[in-house]
Amino acid sequence: RATDERINQAEQELRSELVVHVAVQGTADIGSVLGFTLLLKKVERIGDQAKNILELAEQGVSFADSSERERLFAERQELSALFAEAAELLNASDADDEAIAEYTDRANISVAYYQSKIDEFMTSERPGHEVVPLAIYYRFLRRIGANLVGIVRTSVDPLPHVDYLDDGATDTDD
């Protein structure tokens, strides 16, 4: 929990520095500052979801003996790859709109898959002690994936479309 407190403190300091920047430098950078603030919030959300997964494990939830263990491991690897690719896109010196669009499409496929698993478990005939933890786990994965997409998209388009999906619908996947 000490690490969590240090991270929260660092996030608060970053937000404070962004506010001070606007106060000192004026409003010329307000769009970028708001974009960075939104980006930081999405990163915080991913951290919160990761903590939620840890708390599942701390509460005794284990998929080690699950018949779905291999698939869960493969999905974890895929999500890890999305993290790595997001980092590459964020570290690129120039925004590559095509690469970002391809990333967004692939990540959204994963997000939709996670939702399909949630839907499947919600109507499953399997015992609740099996499917409830899986549904909760997939909900956390879905939110992590959606926020990864949000981070990458916010990095290139900080304000005009934040919290809206491509079709104009509101993105409520916090």
Predicted features and spans:
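Cytosolic, long alpha-helical scaffolding segments
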Residues: 1-174
